[in-house]
């Protein structure tokens, strides 16, 4: 036997029926399960919320000692079995399950399924996955159910072919976003501008596009939701330029060595005004004539979790290749210069560092890095995740090993995940540090 993991629909149906019969027998001898209990898709297992009894409260009162998180704390570190070229999925799952605010949401049992078929709900499966990974079980988990649901809801990812981790991330966020609201809520679930689900609260930012007429200098502004920022790299077919030639500098804590491109360089290029040229004239809304224009992208609204995607895979009519250029990225990132509200980011397309370094609202901390080793045709995905304070681990499917900060920062980098250092609660407009995560 090849010992490969397979998904069998008939066997799962039998398991569901047997589990259902067992639950009926259990229900006949115990109290009825509340309507607020959470259903685990696939097996129909129900977990009641814990309501403390008087004896339990007395026991807790006599044992007030709190559990301390030490350097050897490993709950949440659990490998994932590769089901056949599924490393692209495993590395994203590790990044998502170590996203502090998303972890807190699922482990506090906040999800209430609104899907007509809960067994097809990807949010329910993610909730189950969080419980599995934080159960303390050290043996690798087999995410067969997650893979099956991905195949159902994102058919372009079905099969055992090699897939792209970035493509999986966007597809997963899209399905999670839709399933948070159920399938019958119409346009609201398809428009992130009118959604307040957990996915949009965490991952959605606002990308502002300003098109300026070269004749009358009228500006047309649009703001689009985004879940990530895709950045061009030097060596690609698109034009790129050194941002600080022949001069050492320090931006966002990055050590800028001549010849080394940084994440800040890529963001500078992303937010630099672009001349659209005579072949792309548009009708100006102010002067009502077709004129040449410039376009500039900035961040109108920053997400709680910022994901940066380096365009390492290039597809053209002539060739398909991987760009292996090393990009230096920092542990802490200040996005203030790239905000639409920062006038400095618009001055001749050149980045000006903010004078007020005490503003922490736009500062981020790195917590996950996804890497791709190998070629475009034959490669493998791994991830680095920040587990507790400055402790980093490398997740390579079922194998998890300790890593140093140097290992993380020296890695090639394909996807970078940053978490806001300061969260603002809209209800009370109170800002507080996310001390639990950082």
From Swiss-Prot:
GO terms for biological process: defense response to virus; innate immune response; positive regulation of apoptotic process; positive regulation of type I interferon-mediated signaling pathway; protein deubiquitination; protein K48-linked deubiquitination; protein K63-linked deubiquitination; protein stabilization. It catalyses: Thiol-dependent hydrolysis of ester, thioester, amide, peptide and isopeptide bonds formed by the C-terminal Gly of ubiquitin (a 76-residue protein attached to proteins as an intracellular targeting signal). The keyword Cytoplasm applies. PROSITE patterns: USP_1, USP_2, USP_3. Its main location: cytoplasm. GO terms for cellular component: cytosol; nucleus. Its EC number is 3.4.19.12. Keywords: Cytoplasm, Disease variant, Hydrolase, Immunity, Innate immunity, Intellectual disability, Nucleus, Protease, Thiol protease, Ubl conjugation pathway. The active site is at 87 (nucleophile), 380 (proton acceptor). Interacts with phosphorylated BCL2L11 isoform BIMEL; this interaction leads to BCL2L11 deubiquitination and stabilization. PANTHER family: UBIQUITIN CARBOXYL-TERMINAL HYDROLASE, UBIQUITIN CARBOXYL-TERMINAL HYDROLASE 27. It is linked to Intellectual developmental disorder, X-linked 105: A form of intellectual disability, a disorder characterized by significantly below average general intellectual functioning associated with impairments in adaptive behavior and manifested during the developmental period. Intellectual deficiency is the only primary symptom of non-syndromic X-linked forms, while syndromic forms present with associated physical, neurological and/or psychiatric manifestations. Belongs to the peptidase C19 family. This is Ubiquitin carboxyl-terminal hydrolase 27. It comes from Homo sapiens (Human).
């Amino acid at each position: 036997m090849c010992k490969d993991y397979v998904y069998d629909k008939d066997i799962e149906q039998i398991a569901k029926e047997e589990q259902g019969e067992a639950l009926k027998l259990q229900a006949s001898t115990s109290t009825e399960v509340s309507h607020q209990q959470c259903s685990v898709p696939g097996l129909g297992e129900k977990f009641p919320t814990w309501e403390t009894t008087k004896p339990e409260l007395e026991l807790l009162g006599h044992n007030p000692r709190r559990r301390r998180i030490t350097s050897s704390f490993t709950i949440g570190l659990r490998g994932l079995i590769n089901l056949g070229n599924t490393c692209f999925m495993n590395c994203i799952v590790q990044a998502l399950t170590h996203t502090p605010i998303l972890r807190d949401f699922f482990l506090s049992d906040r999800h209430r399924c609104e899907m007509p078929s809960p067994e097809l709900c990807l949010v329910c499966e993610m909730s189950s996955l969080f419980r599995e990974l934080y159960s303390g079980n050290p043996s690798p988990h087999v995410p067969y159910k997650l893979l099956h649901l991905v195949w159902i809801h994102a058919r372009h990812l079905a099969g055992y072919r090699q897939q792209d981790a970035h493509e999986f991330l966007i597809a997963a966020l899209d399905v999670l976003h839709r399933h948070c609201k159920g399938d019958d809520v119409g346009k609201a679930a398809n428009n992130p501008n009118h959604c307040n689900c957990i996915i949009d609260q965490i991952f959605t930012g606002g990308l502002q596009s300003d098109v300026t007429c070269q004749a009358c200098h009228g500006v047309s502004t649009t703001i689009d939701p985004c879940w990530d920022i895709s950045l061009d790299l030097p060596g690609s077919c698109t034009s790129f330029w050194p941002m600080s030639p022949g001069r050492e500098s320090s931006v966002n804590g990055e050590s800028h060595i001549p010849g080394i491109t940084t994440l800040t360089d890529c963001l500078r290029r992303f937010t630099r005004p672009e001349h659209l040229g005579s072949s792309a004239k548009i009708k100006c809304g102010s002067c009502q004539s077709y004129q040449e224009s410039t376009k500039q992208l900035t961040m109108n609204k920053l997400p709680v979790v910022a994901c940066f995607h380096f365009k390492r895979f290039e597809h053209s009519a002539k060739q398909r290749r991987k760009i292996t250029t090393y990009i230096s990225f920092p542990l802490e990132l200040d996005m203030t210069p790239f905000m639409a509200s920062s006038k400095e980011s618009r001055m001749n397309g050149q980045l000006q560092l903010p004078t007020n370094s005490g503003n922490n609202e736009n500062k981020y901390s790195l917590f996950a890095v996804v890497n791709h080793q190998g070629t475009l045709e034959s490669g493998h995905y791994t991830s680095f995740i920040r587990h507790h304070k400055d402790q980093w681990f490398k997740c390579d499917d079922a194998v998890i090993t300790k890593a140093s900060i140097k290992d993380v920062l020296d890695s090639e980098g394909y996807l970078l995940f940053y978490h806001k250092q300061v969260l603002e609660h809209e209800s009370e407009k109170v800002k507080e540090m996310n001390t639990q995560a950082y």
